[in-house]
From Swiss-Prot:
<comment type="function">
    <text>Protein S19 forms a complex with S13 that binds strongly to the 16S ribosomal RNA.</text>
</comment>
<keyword id="KW-0687">Ribonucleoprotein</keyword>
<keyword id="KW-0689">Ribosomal protein</keyword>
<dbReference type="InterPro" id="IPR023575">
    <property type="entry name" value="Ribosomal_uS19_SF"/>
</dbReference>
<feature type="region of interest" description="Disordered">
    <location>
        <begin position="1"/>
        <end position="24"/>
    </location>
</feature>
<dbReference type="InterPro" id="IPR005732">
    <property type="entry name" value="Ribosomal_uS19_bac-type"/>
</dbReference>
<dbReference type="GO" id="GO:0005737">
    <property type="term" value="C:cytoplasm"/>
</dbReference>
<keyword id="KW-0699">rRNA-binding</keyword>
<dbReference type="InterPro" id="IPR020934">
    <property type="entry name" value="Ribosomal_uS19_CS"/>
</dbReference>
<feature type="region of interest" description="Disordered">
    <location>
        <begin position="73"/>
        <end position="93"/>
    </location>
</feature>
<keyword id="KW-0694">RNA-binding</keyword>
<dbReference type="GO" id="GO:0006412">
    <property type="term" value="P:translation"/>
</dbReference>
<protein>
    <recommendedName>
        <fullName>Small ribosomal subunit protein uS19</fullName>
    </recommendedName>
</protein>
<dbReference type="GO" id="GO:0019843">
    <property type="term" value="F:rRNA binding"/>
</dbReference>
<comment type="similarity">
    <text>Belongs to the universal ribosomal protein uS19 family.</text>
</comment>
<dbReference type="GO" id="GO:0015935">
    <property type="term" value="C:small ribosomal subunit"/>
</dbReference>
<feature type="compositionally biased region" description="Basic and acidic residues">
    <location>
        <begin position="9"/>
        <end position="21"/>
    </location>
</feature>
Length: 93
């Protein structure tokens, strides 16, 4: 069930303050964050966030198509190494 429109998108306050400070200063430094739950808003455009994936911070450059999605969607938490290939040599008929 989507969030109510009257509430607006959720963004952690500390993250919004960092983005606003960089927008006022005109800089685009990398912002480290653990807030995967924050929604990407239009004022995030052009910024790079280092989103924590549970192990390391993954750099995420925000583009226009990302607006409305959550930061955590762009930093996968699981690495898929592929299924194990069948060993035909050890198989009996």
């Amino acid at each position: 069930m989507p969030r109510s429109l009257k509430k607006g998108p959720f963004v952690d306050d500390h993250l919004q303050k960092k983005v606003d400070a960089q927008n006022e200063a005109g800089t685009h430094n990398v912002i480290r964050t653990w807030s995967r739950r924050s929604v990407v808003t239009p004022d995030f455009l052009g910024h790079t966030f280092a989103v924590h994936d549970g192990r390391k911070h993954t750099p995420v450059f925000v583009t226009e198509s990302m607006v409305g999605h959550k930061l955590g969607e762009f930093a996968p938490t699981r690495t898929f190494k592929g299924h194990e290939k069948d060993d035909r040599k050890g198989r009996r008929r």
